[in-house]
């Protein structure tokens, strides 16, 4: 038997309750975008997901149900910043944009840079290779519009 002398890989920090809520909301939105099931059915399915009990339940509910309820308005808010029709977005990109747009509009207690970073992380974790760059660019432009004062103060 040989001993492994390689340096120990640092453990990733534990996910925050809000990050778990965002991940679960993205998964729920993905399901909803694909089959338009009743939001209650989508949510019930997610209750069995690993980590659901560690998620910020209130934030999850707000993101999932709020993004579904306001899907048309949220999509309309970021559509001017797209370089292609909404129908051509991957479901993961679209779900990440919905989560980010919802937080930018409704969760003003969360700094816009945090909102964008979290949406980018969702796209990196669940999306295609370059999708996160697209999500970043679209949400950055949306933030400049819906949180103009905050963005101007930070730049």
Curated annotation (Swiss-Prot):
Q: Which GO terms describe its cellular component?
A: cytosol
Q: Quote the Pfam families the UniProt record gives.
A: NusB (PF01029)
Q: Name one GO molecular function term.
A: RNA binding
Residues spanning the membrane = none
Keyword annotations: RNA-binding, Transcription, Transcription antitermination, Transcription regulation
InterPro entries named among the record's database cross-references: NusB-like_sf (IPR035926), NusB_fam (IPR011605), NusB_RsmB_TIM44 (IPR006027)
Question: Which GO terms fall under biological process for this protein?
Answer: DNA-templated transcription termination; transcription antitermination
Please describe what this protein does: Involved in transcription antitermination. Required for transcription of ribosomal RNA (rRNA) genes. Binds specifically to the boxA antiterminator sequence of the ribosomal RNA (rrn) operons.
Which PANTHER family does the annotation name? ANTITERMINATION NUSB DOMAIN-CONTAINING PROTEIN, N UTILIZATION SUBSTANCE PROTEIN B-RELATED
Family that this chain belongs to: Belongs to the NusB family.
Name listed for the protein in its UniProt record: Transcription antitermination protein NusB
Source organism of the structure: Ralstonia nicotianae (strain ATCC BAA-1114 / GMI1000)
